[in-house]
Amino acid sequence: MKPELLRIFGVINGALIAALVLIAGSEAYLRLTIPASSGESIYRYTLETRRYKVMKPNVAVSAWGKELRTNELGFRDNSAAIPPKQPDEFRIIVLGSSFTVSAGVDYADIYTSRLEQQLRKIDPKVKVINLAVGGYNPLQYELVLKEVGLSLDPDMVLVALFPDSDFRLDIYEENRRVAEGKAPEARPSAWDEHLYTYRAYGRRIADKVKSILVRPSGQSSDFQARRAWLENTAALQRIAQTARERKLPLAVAVLPHTFNFIRQREEFGRIQRFCREQQLPCLNLLESFIARQVPEGQLRLNVLDSHPNEKYNAIVANVLTSELGPVLPALKDRDSDWASAATVRRAEFQR
């Protein structure tokens, strides 16, 4: 073999060895610094409800080293059951998805728990109940409200909207297929999915390349997106109507993802217009995060999981407390203009 070819092969082999050493070192570092999860699924798929996917009741799993426990109703809690409503208790139920479940964060540090703690400094009788389930959209929020929430005798409904995935139907329809036995509950993972290094860095590169090479199919994709928007916004309107009929104050907190705050403004603007048209009480938390200038990377659980950490939850709780705290006395009076109005006046979009 010619010397030039030998040198080329030597350079290639050296680069491959260096890459393998780098990957191995990165893998070891990530596994040493990121707590493991227990791995078992907390979900059950069922045709007993049109939610199709529910969390198993009275179970505990570990998410990134933090316990996630459910109560007898199948919602995140640190108690086995939601206690009976006490005299003069002001009960807030929170509907939402994975950013409200907040797996990977201690129960005491998720924003619903923090909100309860902070509002109790104003009124010790406040109780905040987390009724969120990962992967849900407004269609399922509505079902949770009607199937579970109203039976808990709430005094207020708080919807935690997550624009990044709330106006889609693909996850919901996949849940239905699994419940019907037409799709597997968990798809087998490729070998590289077990590597922390790939999940932290390689997947993003692969997704970026895929987004460039694979374009959605024009009219069909537009139709599906429009259908998803209409069905989920209609569900929000029905939630608002139910709240009005029950004379329950309603607030909609719109939560940002932990990536690309500025790019999210377009979608938040669309939701802002919808809220104003429908007179829905929406609070734009994206602007609250941008104003605080906290680096987005400091709000994620870790490099493998972009779900919110303790700092993100603390910001959400602080914003909600600043909006709801001053008007808590009016919220408690169902005969006041506040309780019967279509909007929560302090919880409107400011931008």
Language-model regions: role of each:
Residues 34-123, 289-293, 299-303, 351:
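Membrane/wall-proximal cationic-aromatic binding patches
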Residues 162-280, 285-298, 302, 334-351:
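Serine-dependent acyl-ester chemistry module
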Residues 14, 301-345:
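Histidine-centered active-site loop/cap adjacent to the catalytic His
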Residues 11-27:
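Hydrophobic membrane-insertion alpha-helices, especially the h-region
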Residues 67-69, 91-93, 99-185:
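Conserved SGNH/GDSL esterase-like catalytic core that processes O-acyl groups on lipids
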Residues 27, 97, 141, 157, ...:
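Generic structural signal for small/hydrophobic residues in well-ordered secondary structure
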Residues 89-90, 124-126, 152-157, 244-251, ...:
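Loop/turn elements at helix/coil->beta-strand transitions in domains of secreted/extracellular proteins
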Residues 113, 117, 143, 234-237, ...:
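Solvent-exposed, polar/charged alpha-helical surfaces in well-ordered, non-transmembrane soluble domains
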